């Protein structure tokens, strides 16, 4: 089940080609992405200090404090809904690696 929210998070595509997709996500307080699955491994770079609430497929909700500039990565196949649990806007950049083999230079 997805978080109940009055407003969805806003994705803004920054760059996309055959190897990567880079998206900026902006969340008003209480906004959520909606339930989704990541097809590719991805990295997140936080743009704001925030409280991120994450709902897992089993319904468990975790609450994580994130700092601006903090980064983390996750593998492909992650299923979740992400909500801004802060009282202020939350933003991050998501970098999805669509074809990692093409990012490696031939020797």
Q: Residue spans of the language-model regions?
A:
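A short glycine-rich, His/Asp/Glu-containing loop-to-beta-strand
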Residues: 5-35, 41-44, 92-95
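Short histidine-centered beta-strand/loop micro-motifs
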Residues: 12, 25, 33-38, 55-56, ...
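Short acidic-glycine-tyrosine-enriched beta hairpin
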Residues: 15, 58-77
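Histidine-centered metal-chelating micro-motifs
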Residues: 30-33, 69-83
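Glycine- and acidic-residue-biased ligand/ion/polar-headgroup-sensing regions
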Residues: 38-58
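Ligand-binding loop in jelly-roll beta-barrel domains
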Residues: 76-100
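Extracytoplasmic/periplasmic copper-protein system
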Residues: 103-107
């Amino acid at each position: 089940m997805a978080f109940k929210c009055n407003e969805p998070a806003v994705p803004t595509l920054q760059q996309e080609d055959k190897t990567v997709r880079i998206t900026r996500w902006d969340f008003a307080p209480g906004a959520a992405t909606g339930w989704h699955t990541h097809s590719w491994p991805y990295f997140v770079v936080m743009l704001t200090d925030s409280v991120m609430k994450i709902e897992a497929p089993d319904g468990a909700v975790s609450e994580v404090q994130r700092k601006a500039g903090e980064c983390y990565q996750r593998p492909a196949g992650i299923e979740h809904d992400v909500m801004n649990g802060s009282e202020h806007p939350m933003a991050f950049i998501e970098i999805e690696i669509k074809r990692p083999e093409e990012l490696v230079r031939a020797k």
